């Protein structure tokens, strides 16, 4: 398989959609404070649809190829005649690069965490999820039992 050696493929990152300094809202000048929080993009919905279809789901809305090609058309890429799940994941990586750690969570969800180790850094399963704050565990002790 591929050897992952770059930050965008292996770590949580959110660096897209920053505005040029002449378009900043006065008073909102800290790193990241001037960008609106994007919950989800239509391209991501299309890519999730394509992933579900390549994993065996059915749909009357559109095919996996149609979903991928809708994303590719917007960015000026040539259409594909067929797609595999691996191609869908690569398309998702390209389309959503640097957005919200999507690749990181995909790799954890798909059990491909070996791809998250690179440059002498080793991913371990305890890094899959953020810890539950101790104040919440103190309020509801059963939360601490899932370690």
Q: Model-flagged regions — what are they?
A:
Residues 36-70, 85-94:
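Extended, hydrophobic/aromatic-rich amphipathic alpha-helical segments that build helical scaffolds
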Residues 32, 36-37, 72, 77-147:
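Long, intrinsically disordered, low-complexity segments
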